[in-house]
Amino acid sequence: MASPSKGNDLFSSDEEGPAMVAGPGPGPGGAEGAAEERRVKVSSLPFSVEALMSDKKPPKETSPRPAESASAGATLRPLLLPGHGVREAHSPGPLVKPFETASVKSENSEDGAAWMQEPGRYSPPPRHMSPTTCTLRKHKTNRKPRTPFTTSQLLALERKFRQKQYLSIAERAEFSSSLNLTETQVKIWFQNRRAKAKRLQEAELEKLKMAAKPMLPSGFSLPFPINSPLQAASLYGASYPFHRPVLPIPPVGLYATPVGYGMYHLS
């Protein structure tokens, strides 16, 4: 029959953990090994007194297995379409970007080559000018043809116009019937003839204005005749007791400047 101390050891060993029960039987050597193992575990803790006193760093954690890391990477990698995967496998991104920038730069250089050939000269690109179309005045489609007046009709109309430029309705009706014309034709002819007479009158007035303008400029006017030496002498103080001799006056045509600047030679 087992002693009570042995029973207590069995119960304590059951409480400590399954590692202690798994052995063949408790012995003095097994108990010492378990105590040493507990001391090692306690001393290996980073917050234990022994670890703080010894100032030892805890051992680094071992890296996970490569299979686990590969599986984690496979789970974290986003899903891609088949086309994307092939494109990434055959053409990496860093190699494509310089090629794209180089192609853009080459295109820009080709565009600017024509501008940089002659740096001292500005030559804008040629413009394609569209030919200018001559816009003519469009006549009305329902326009009536001009009335071909005969010579006798024109003479009668001119004679009537010199007598009276404005006809009343009764006079116009009577005159048009005598010439075998409509009232509208006579009315339009008189309107055109009055406009022509007005233009001729304005041209005559313009000719009269041009003829009335003096040939000499307006500032070239003399208040006295040049050939009268007495009036010229009176301007220079001839009434004083000491008279200046009157000098002969040269003709005015020899001077290009106005008369006041050198008409008289004073000594």
Curated annotation (Swiss-Prot):
Region annotation (Disordered) ranges: 1-74, 105-147
InterPro entries membership: HD, HD_metazoa, Homeobox_CS, Homeodomain-like_sf, Msh_Homeobox_Regulators
Pfam families on file: Homeodomain
Major localization class: nucleus
Biased composition (Basic residues): 136-146
DNA-binding region per UniProt: 142-201
Compartment list: Nucleus
GO BP, one annotated term: regulation of transcription by RNA polymerase II
GO cellular component terms given for this protein: nucleus
Gene Ontology molecular function: DNA-binding transcription factor activity, RNA polymerase II-specific; RNA polymerase II transcription regulatory region sequence-specific DNA binding; transcription cis-regulatory region binding
Alphabetically ordered keywords of this record: Developmental protein, DNA-binding, Homeobox, Nucleus, Osteogenesis, Repressor, Transcription, Transcription regulation
Primary role: Acts as a transcriptional regulator in bone development. Represses the ALPL promoter activity and antagonizes the stimulatory effect of DLX5 on ALPL expression during osteoblast differentiation. Probable morphogenetic role. May play a role in limb-pattern formation. In osteoblasts, suppresses transcription driven by the osteocalcin FGF response element (OCFRE). Binds to the homeodomain-response element of the ALPL promoter.
Family statement: Belongs to the Msh homeobox family.
Protein's name according to its UniProt entry: Homeobox protein MSX-2
Gene assigned in the entry: MSX2
